Amino acid sequence: MEGSDDDDGVPQLSSHALAALQEFYAEQQQREAQKLGPDHEKFSVGSVEEDWQLSQFWYSDETALSLAKEAIEVCGENGRIACISAPSIYQKLRGLAGESVYIRLLEYDNRFAVYGDDFVFYDYNEPLKLPESLEPSSFDIVIADPPYLSEECLQNTAQTIKHLSRGKIILCTGAVMEDLAAQKLGLKKCKFIPEHTRNLANEFRCYSNYELALDKQGLA
């Protein structure tokens, strides 16, 4: 009954379990406090922890940095870059690029709202539900990493990519999606192979509609 003070039948934690639980919460609070501290790098990969329930697996520092440099080289000093479901690339971009580069992170996870106006809430189930500020064909390069290896997810994300892009596209996804990437976006497999901080069960590849500078430089 609502508001009852009767504790009969309610399981009680042992003193040992309660102490362990309190220790866990204390450690969690300490980690969050460190993130807000002056020594924490706001734009470092891993500053926001992976949420596996959202199919989040961050790129390695080297991969995120390589793709960020690729995007900056493509768009130039006053370019426009969209990152769709690719927060670790966004983090490297914002750490490298000057304020003259317009960068937007389209992402479902609201924890990334800490990045202010750069953050745009994005749900691939509603691929064209975007703010008016994200005009059609307004980005020099779009980098996307659809969260799920499903035909529906890639098809919907492809709608967003085609809406935003006025030129270059980089797609990072599983090798099993190669045919669909070619069919929906006209992309070809790159030599460059993206890596993650954790080993994934599925083979992961990079696709684009142009020859990556990374491939030309032999950094694949």
UniProtKB/Swiss-Prot annotation:
One of its GO terms (biological process) is peptidyl-lysine methylation. Its EC number is 2.1.1.-. It is found in: Cytoplasm. This is EEF1A lysine methyltransferase 1. Keywords: Cytoplasm, Methyltransferase, Transferase. Belongs to the class I-like SAM-binding methyltransferase superfamily. EFM5 family. Its main location: cytoplasm. The gene is eef1akmt1.
